[in-house]
Regions:
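Alpha-helical repeat scaffolds in large eukaryotic proteins
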Residues: 82, 314-318, 342
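Inter-helical turn/loop segments and adjacent helix faces that build the functional surface
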Residues: 228-229, 320-324
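Short, flexible/disordered intra-domain loops and linkers
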Residues: 171-175, 294, 365-368
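Residues that form generic nucleotide/phosphate-binding pockets
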Residues: 53, 200, 316, 364, ...
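Catalytic core of nucleotide-sugar-dependent glycosyltransferases
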Residues: 258-263, 269-322
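Membrane-interface aromatic/basic loop that binds lipid-linked glycans or pyrophosphate carriers
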Residues: 156, 323-385
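P-loop NTPase catalytic cores that bind/hydrolyze ATP
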Residues: 237-245, 307-311, 335-339
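Nucleotide-sugar donor-binding/catalytic module of glycosyltransferases
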Residues: 1-284
Length: 385
């Protein structure tokens, strides 16, 4: 039976966490290794709820760490499964054995909790897993999500499924389509990255982000040594583009197996309200550089994240031996994001000193049509087809 590793970042989600975790521990597929990563939550109960479930279900390992953002939390789980952590027993408390990271600790993990009844000896070792999947802690799965994925993962690098958007009260439902709907995949199929790039071109989309939208073959992920870029937003663009550029087979599963909650006080901040609560601890220096003007700091972070993302992608493509799949991904997607990154030149204050890096990006910008133009051309094409 294949083993599925699950990584769930947790940050101030006491209102949503139980529903999320119930959808995990009650999956019809049971051979799971569940990693909860408390990313420095400051609310009253997120960590306590995580501990409650870690005692309830022996498949759960709980990491408590410094606030570092979504990328850092996910990377904690990835690094654990990559077996990069050497752990030492710390103590026994409240039904747990606790451990610390004894070697390099890039995500600043404070403590690792595991139900003491799991152990014969006081040693915590990372399990071997076959597949990896992410879940955000304010979202949830259909109870057959993992089962539906696993039975399709044979010789597949990435499985991509559809999701259902659930709007929290006060958030406007604008009837937005999911990427699966935009790409018009209605039947299950296996594609390659070149096929994906071609379909993106046809529908006028440049969305290649990937994090919680499917399952990844773990040996494939480990082979390409991919992690998320820390301390940026929209981190799933970099992750997704490298993932797809490195893959051979992608399974398209147009089933809505994931429930995505759109709420205001989150990293993605779908209702565009910006408050001090949206600026996380790890953005503190930027926040202070803008005299605690949350709106300006968040706008700078948004633009800076684009630049950092594209610079990392350029490094990747320049260091990769090109094939027709990676070439298609690079040529269709990189110019679009490079062009967006160059909008950074309009910023007046630059605490990260990124303006000097823009010259590295300019050669990758081509004459590309804006997204609206692609939609218009597609409509014209449909009229005359």
């Amino acid at each position: 039976m294949k083993t599925v590793g699950i990584v769930i970042p947790i940050y101030n989600v006491e209102k949503y966490l139980r529903e999320c975790l119930e959808s995990v521990i009650n999956q019809t597929y049971v051979n799971l290794e569940i990693i909860l990563v408390n990313d420095g939550s400051t609310d009253e109960n997120s960590l306590n709820i995580a501990k409650e479930y870690a005692l309830k279900d022996k498949r759960i390992t709980l990491f408590d760490k410094e606030n570092g953002g979504l990328s850092s939390a996910r990377n904690t789980g990835i690094e654990f499964f990559y077996k990069e952590y050497e752990t030492h027993f710390s103590n026994e408390i409240d039904g747990f054995y606790t451990f610390t990271v004894a070697n390099e600790n890039p995500q600043n993990v404070y403590k690792i909790y595991k139900n003491k009844n799991t152990f014969i000896e006081k040693n915590l070792e990372a399990p071997d897993i076959d597949y990896l999947i992410f879940l955000d802690s304010d979202n949830s799965w259909e109870l057959n999500c993992i089962e539906e994925c696993v039975k399709r993962m044979q010789d597949i690098d990435i499985l991509w499924f559809d999701h259902l958007c659930v709007y929290e009260k006060g958030i406007e439902d604008k009837g937005q389509k999911t990427r699966m709907q935009i790409f018009s995949y209605k039947e299950e199929c296996i594609i390659n990255p070149k096929d994906y790039a071609k379909r993106a071109l046809e529908v006028g989309s440049r969305d290649i982000s990937f994090s919680w939208g499917g399952m990844i073959d773990f040996n494939f992920l480990k082979k390409i040594k991919l992690k998320f870029v820390n301390y940026i937003i929209n981190e799933d663009i970099h992750f997704g583009m490298i993932l797809f550029a490195s893959a051979n087979k992608i399974y398209v599963l147009p089933k809505r197996l994931y429930k995505c909650l759109l709420r205001s006080n989150s990293i993605s901040n779908h209702d565009k309200k910006v408050t001090k609560a949206n600026i996380s601890h790890y953005f503190k220096n930027i926040y202070e550089a803008f005299n605690e003007d949350a709106k300006s700091a968040k706008e700078y972070l948004r633009l800076a994240s684009r630049v950092i993302t594209v610079l990392k992608l350029i490094d990747f493509f320049q260091g990769k031996k090109e094939n027709e799949n990676s070439k298609a991904i690079k040529e269709i997607f990189l110019p679009f994001y490079a062009k967006k990154a160059l909008k950074f030149k309009k910023v007046n204050k630059d605490p990260l000193n990124l303006k000097n890096e823009l010259d590295k990006i300019k050669p990758f910008v081509k004459n590309i049509l804006p997204y609206d133009a692609w939609k218009i051309l597609q409509k014209i094409k449909n009229i005359f087809s």
